[in-house]
Regions:
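Catalytic core of the metallo-beta-lactamase
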Residues: 10-94
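Accessory terminal helices/loops
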Residues: 75-88, 95-174
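Short, small-residue-biased leader/transition segments that mark boundaries at the very start
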Residues: 1-9
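Generic alpha-helical secondary structure signal
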Residues: 4, 48-49, 103
């Protein structure tokens, strides 16, 4: 693209780092809990929350992945919810609970008032709820390949002698 500055990835952010996207000032917020590396990126009146929060009727991300921690997740959610109430929150994904149409945007005010895992709950209540719920969840279907790519910082494995790249999937260990 002409006239657009590009950069070589990866770029690593620390909590509170500021950066620019075009003319927009942005802030990186470290929001661990789902995994240790989770980040929320605030851009103007919008925040991209990754797997920290879901839509209010979906609650929050699981915290039983490697390095996940329900207490950290609660603290991270509180950090996101400390943004102004009108801040638009964009979800990483949505499961459309109870047959609801898929949505991807809510606000801080909506989450505070209606999130089924957060609204009216103390930190200890959230940890108990999240821990109990996580014990009932199956391993995601793509967790093995996802971990292999994530552990390489998003890079795929090196190609074999034929130039093909492979992820390993155990057939008798799950």
């Amino acid at each position: 693209m002409t006239g657009v500055q590009t950069c070589a990835l990866p770029i690593f952010f620390d909590d509170g780092d500021t950066y620019r996207v075009g003319t927009m000032d942005c802030i990186a917020l470290h929001t661990p809990g789902h995994t240790p590396a989770c980040m929320t990126h605030v851009m103007g009146d919008a925040a991209f929350v990754g797997d920290t929060l879901f839509m209010p009727d979906g609650g929050s991300a699981r915290a039983d992945f490697p390095g996940g921690d329900a207490g950290q997740l609660y603290d991270s959610i509180q950090k996101v919810l400390s943004l102004p109430g009108e801040t638009r929150l964009f979800m990483c994904h949505d499961y459309g609970p109870n047959g609801r149409d898929i949505r991807w945007e809510t606000t801080v005010a909506e989450e505070k008032a209606h999130n089924v895992h957060i609204s009216g709950k103390t930190r200890d209540e959230f940890i108990a709820l999240r821990t109990a719920r996580d014990k009932t969840l199956d391993m995601p279907k793509l967790i093995i390949p996802s971990l292999q790519v994530n552990m390489r910082g998003g890079d795929l494995p090196p190609p074999d002698e034929d130039g093909k790249r492979f992820l390993k999937v155990p057939i008798n260990g799950l």
